[in-house]
Structure formats: C-alpha cells, structure tokens
Amino acid sequence: MAEQTEKAFLKQPKVFLASKKTGKGKRPGKGGNRFWKSIGLGFKTPREAIDGTYIDKKCPFTGTVSIRGRILAGTCHSAKMNRTIIVRRNYLHFIKKYQRYEKRHSNIPAHVSPCFRVKEGDHVIIGQCRPLSKTVRFNVLKVIPAGSSGGVKKAFTAI
C-alpha cells in the first residue's frame, strides 16, 4: 500500500484494507484501496493523488482536511522543510506623505502534499484550511512550474 517508514503502521482512516474485493474504483471515495476526493472550487485532483501510494493525513485530496476561506497565489520562496514550503507574496504599499509606493512582502507557510513536486521559484496557489500546526494554515492546491509563464508576455523585451 504505502512506504512504511514510520514506527506506526500508516493507513488511510477511511479505507478497509482486509477487503476480499479487488475492484479498483475510479469515482471519488473509498472505491479500491485508496481514498481520494475532489476538493471543488475548480481545482482538479492530481493524478499522483489518485494513483499514488503516499499517506498524508493533511493532504487536501487524500486526507481529512477541507479547504475553506481564502485562496491565495504566490511564489515558493523556500522548500527546505519536510512537506512545508514558504510562499512569498509581493505587494505595494502606498505612502500618503510622499505620494509613492513602497515594495513589501509577506511570507506564508503552507503544507505541500507529496503529490506535488515544488521547487523554489515555482508559482503556487494555496487555500486556507484549519490550523495544521502552530504556524501552518494553508495547503498547496496547484503548482505552476517556474519555466512556464501560463501565456503571460513580459512587459519589456529586448528586440
């Protein structure tokens, strides 16, 4: 079923492993030996979440976490932690006295499911969920690799 690397036996809580049936269901739910769900909001469930063998109770697709609240976009600033990334959001703040803007940023820690491969510089879309730890309140829903810009042209290009 899954890579057993912990002392406790890893299993999904909604799947009965001793079933005599061998049918693999392709509908969201408990068909087969893997539970997965569609989170809605226009986000597709990744193929790795459906066919993969990882166990992650904090994954929005295969775990017990529901996405509600804010949906934010940002850039992966750090991917050094285990299953957690830091998402950097840049914005402009207006200074009334000088009638100018200054650059500011905010760092948001987000849980990343093993079904995603996230590197520094990738654009990610994160969704708010219940508190997963002391600081983590968001979950990665979609990853856009750094090389693909998604059809957006650069403003200034050399001819």
From Swiss-Prot:
Alphabetized UniProt keyword annotations: Ribonucleoprotein, Ribosomal protein, RNA-binding, rRNA-binding
Listed GO MF terms: rRNA binding; structural constituent of ribosome
CDD domains, per the entry: Ribosomal_uS17
InterPro entries hit by this protein: NA-bd_OB-fold (IPR012340), Ribosomal_uS17 (IPR000266), Ribosomal_uS17_arc/euk (IPR028333), Ribosomal_uS17_CS (IPR019979), Ribosomal_uS17_N (IPR032440)
SUPFAM superfamilies tied to this protein: Nucleic acid-binding proteins
GO terms of biological process kind: translation
Entry-linked PROSITE patterns: RIBOSOMAL_S17
An annotated GO cellular component: cytosolic small ribosomal subunit
Entry protein name: Small ribosomal subunit protein uS17
